[in-house]
Structure formats: structure tokens, C-alpha cells
Curated annotation (Swiss-Prot):
Record's protein name: Envelope glycoprotein H
Keyword Glycoprotein tagged: yes
Region (Interaction with gL): 177-239
Transmembrane stretches, start-end: 694-714
Assigned GO CC terms: host cell endosome membrane; host cell plasma membrane; membrane; viral envelope; virion membrane
Gene for this chain: gH
Keyword Transmembrane helix among record annotations: yes
Amino acid sequence: MTILQLFLVFLNILEALCDYQLPKPRINKPPAEERLKLRNGYNTTLIEFDDGVQSFNLNWTKIIEHIPHDELIELWREANVTEPLVNTLLKRSDTYRPETNVHIPGHGNSYACALPYWSYTIDQWEDNKTTGYLGNFGIPSKTVLNEFFYDFQYVYTNRQFYTEATYVLNCLIGATTPAYPTISCHITPNYLFVSVEFTKFDSLTLLFGHSHYLPPLKGHIVYNDIEGASNDVFSLVIFSTYDLFGKHVESFKFDIAKVFREIIETPPLTFIKNLQDEMFTIEIRDGCNINNIVNPKTFLFAFKAVVAHFLVIDSLRTQQHILLNCFANYMSELEFLRKLMESCFEFFEFDFPYTVIETLAASQALNVPKHVITSLSHQDKTNMLSLFRLSRHSKHVSAVAISEIIDLISHIYTAYSYTYMLTSSERKMLLDAYIVLNDIMHKNETVKKQDLLPYVLSSSMCTSLEIGNLLLHFGQKDVLDVYETFSPCYLSLRFDFTKEKLITEFPQSSLIAQKEINLGTNGFFQTLHMRHHTSLEILPIIKCIKSLSTDIILSIPLKNITYVISTKPVPNSKIYDVSEVFLKTSMIISAVNNDCKPYQGGSAAHQIPVIYNVTVPRRGCPYCSSVVLSYDESQGFQSMMYITDTYVQENLFTEHSPFFGDGNLHIHYLILMNNGTVIEVRGAYRARLVNFIIVIMVFILFLVGLYLLYKLFVYLT
């Protein structure tokens, strides 16, 4: 054996032994007597190597005092010291090396949830009780960190580096049946790695972690060869082979330095939000077929999603206490990201426990004063909604959360009645409310009538204008914004969403290409059917309308009565048939008693009376708890507005109200009263339209007159 070969042998042994981490607990620990025999058998064994440049001395006595015999054998096997040098060189030459290795000075963005100077800390909480309700206090970082890293196990790394025993979180993306490709990920306290496994033996792995605490490599590679980017704290490394690169060249088409910059330079919540947008876009645009995993877009998304979780956990190591509401925001946004991934991929599993934060969030939610949310700042509203989201599975929180969410949506709805538009921050808060209500309402066996108000208000904000704007967004944006594309329609009690219906709602313009119409219609339709989880099951009258569930267009639960808009009448209800004015479809309005008691006035359809010139009432709110509904003679139901207070009433019936500003004589308006009475509204909105038509006709006649005078002048001259 040459000196070079001896040197490589001892180098491998030293590296394996020096970097070995002792598992807890030891596995297959030999009895004390056997260990004593082994120690006596090896206590004179010394291994020395000295080539004049470096010297190595291994004392078996010291080694076996700390490493059990069977594990020592496993170390020897994994070190593979008898491997021919030719094989080692071949593996080295076949190791894939990125074209560049970029170093970016600095530490990158901080994920730390630092405590403000005015905050306080809580190290223990008895009976899960805390003070305050916005999470403005610090909690021990170690308590949260210990919950994440509870599972001590071996980390197997597809032969890139030595097996390590450490704390680890695992995730897997793949198919419900054993198949390739799959994506596996592993998060440890110091690093993470994500692998796309093409076969049992071929994989592409990205590793990200603290530069000085990366796992020990095997002898044929060094980090300088495979590192793609780094800063003063973290490194990003790629593991693969040139042989695999040749087989899956498309999967390697990404800029590793650009990915690293995106990770370290994007603010934390923005980075997580961008990942939510990216996942949503992949789901709507590209689909979530398991074969798309080999696409670099999907693989890089999965890698960045795992990095986001790692960086949030890693922030716990930098401080003794963390601010609860700050960390709760991270947890709620990461949870939503995982929910998006779960709804997309055929098989998705991510071990990410957060019971400590969940428990503290519930304790804070239970302290929330009644009707306080609308008086809070935007950031405090966000903090409260994050606490509700994390604690929504606690049955004790349900009543508090629903009460505050009703106030919040009512506040948003009143502001909406002025402009008929929603801001990005309002859509985000509606999304938070949607997440909370979705879980709570479907778990409640009995639903109170007042708890249905968010669904009525959401139905009111799901107007033709809202649908048209969303169709444009889905049709024209390359990256879909998960907040901007969230619609009140997902919380509505509308059930008439078909592709044909959506096409009629698309804004009419010669500037809109057919491709945009197709993208918009398909995207919004797909999202509606994924996100619109509102069910008739939450309605108290479900037992008397269940047989007509497929015929229902809209349900409007009011305080004293529930209106059901459908293509067939609801038995034992007060019926208004408006089908005689339709050209293509039919629509029947049924007023159903909330206790499902039969209507005593007979089964014959009632005629809808007409009133004219509805104006804003000067005093009081006579239309409160009523609904104004619009429908088209050709396309059927269009929009509705529920009148909650005098502000909404005034905005609805004002002269410039967008609700009555369609300018289409084929659109009719009905008022559905809280006592079961339905009336048709005609008046100012039609008078304005008639006046507009008269002005147009006069203008046309004026132009014709000018033209005739011009022709006469030409003829005479």
C-alpha cells in the first residue's frame, strides 16, 4: 500500500470519528462485561501514521470508551476505507459542480422576533392562562424549540455524507402509491436538505445551513467544489452527478445564486407570502400532477418552502425569549402555506408540531374583550386574526372568534358599500376570517342564526363587478396573488357558479384576448370549486330544502325568514315566481320559515308588487335586515346587497349608487323583506337611463340636421 493510500485510509477514519455525534439513547449497547473484554483486548492497540508532514495517532482505548462496539463496526463499514482509490477518483470526477460559487457579504434578513422595550416575559403559564389578548409578551425560545426537535433519529443522506444521529423534522411529497419521482426533506438544528428522487439510486439534493455546521462529507468531495452560493452565515450546496445531469438536464435549469439571494434578501413574511403566491400559481396554472415534481419550478418551490420553515425555527436560537404575536404570525402563515401544498399534491406529509404556540394563542383568544376588533390598528387586527387562526381548533375559542369576525366583516362591508371595491388588506383579513370560519362552522353541530351573518355579507360582496375583476386578474397575471385573488364569493351562499355563468360576467372589451378569457374563466372556476367550501349543511333550514340542493342558486338566511332562490319551488313555503320575465332560464323565490313550519297561505305563486322612485329614507332604517337583489332577464341572478345599517341603506339608494348603475333595462331589482314580502323596485335608475337615451337621440338628430344643412349648402353652391 502506498503512502498516499495509507494517508487516505487514515483521513477517512479520522473524519468519520471526529465528526461522529453520539446518538441518544445508544442503540444495542453491549453489556458491561462484554465492553470490559473488548477494552482489555484492544488496550494495547495504537495506530500511528507519520509521513514527515502530518502525523496521526489513534488510541483504541479512548475510542471504545465512548463508542459502542456495534456502532464502531458500522462506522468502519460506512467509512469504506477499503474502497479502491480508482473508485474514489471516479466518484470525485462524476460529482456535479455548479458553474459558479457566489459569496454575498453580510448576514441576510433576520427572522428574530425581538421583544420591544415595553414588553414583558412569561416563562411559565399555569392552567394555560395568560394576561392580555394580543400576544404582546415574550415566551422562552427553548420551550418552542424543544417541541420542534423532539425526534432524535438517524438522518440518511443518499450517500452524499455520513449518516448522522440528530434531531430532525421530515416531510415528503409524492404519490399515494409507491412511485418515483418523490421529494423528501429533512430539517435539523443546523441545516436542511431537500432531495428529488428520480429512482431509488438517483437524486438531486439541495442543502442549506450554517456554513460552519454542515454535515461531514465523504472523502471524494469537499464543500468548495459543490457550493453554489454563501454569505457570512449560510451556504447553499448542490449534490448530484454529471451522469444524472445528462438524464435530467431540465431539472438543473435554475440559477442557484439567484435562489440564494431570494432566500437571504427577502423580508421573512414577504418571502413566505411569495411562496404562497407561487404555490397557488403552480396549482392553477401548471397543475399538481406528480410528474411535475421534476420541473425545476416545483422542486425549487418545495426547497424554498422548507427553507422558510428552517429559518423561522433557526431564529429561536438567537434569543432567549421571542415575542408571541410575531412568532404566531410566522406560524399561521406557514400553516397556510402547508395547507396550499396539501391541497395541491397527491401526497403531502410535513411533521411540524406547534402545540405550545397553539395553546398560548387559545389562552390569548379567550381574553379578547367583546366587540374590540374594529377599534384596533391594522397590525393589531392582523395579530388577533393570527391568534384566532392558530387556536381555531379549540372549542372554547369558537364563540369569541365568531363574534369578533362578525364585527370585522360587518365593518369591511360598510366600507365596501361606499365604493364596491375591496383593498388588498381587506381581502387578507377576509382570508383570515375564511380560514377560521371554515373550520369552526363545519364542526359545530348547531349553528346560531346570528353566526350566519358573515355568509350573507360575503354573498352581498360577491357581485358581478367583483367576479369580473377576479376574472381579469386570473386571465392577465403571470403570478397569481393569493390575497388579491381571494374573493368573498368563497364564503358566499351562492351556488350558481358555472363556466357559462362566469363567461357572461367577463368584462366586455375588444382589448381582452380570447386566451385571457379562457385563462380567467378556467382559473376562477377552478379556484371557486377548491375554495368555496360553504355548504347548505350550515343552514338551520337544511332539513326542509335538502331534496332541492342541486337546484338552489342562492340562499339568504335573515333573522325571521330564509329566502331560497332556485329553479324549483321549496315545498311548504311562500313562493314568488319570476320566471315569466326570463328568456333563457327560470327563477323562483321561496320564503321559508327558519323552523321549517309550513306556510299557511297556500302553495300558489304570489305576484310581485311594483313600487317606483325609491329614495333614501330621511329617518331611521326601514330597509334594515332586508335584501336588494338584481337579476337579468337572460342570465338570471346577478347581485345582492344586505342592508345592515343606515350607512349601507344610504349608500345603496343614493343617486350615484353603482348597484343601480348598470344602465341595462333588462336588469330587474327586488327587495326581499325580513317578513317574507318581496317587491320589485322601479324608478330613478330607469328614469336616469331613459333621460340618457333621450339625450343620445337628441344629439343624433342634431348631427343629422347638421349633415342635411351641409348637403343643402353644397347643393346650393
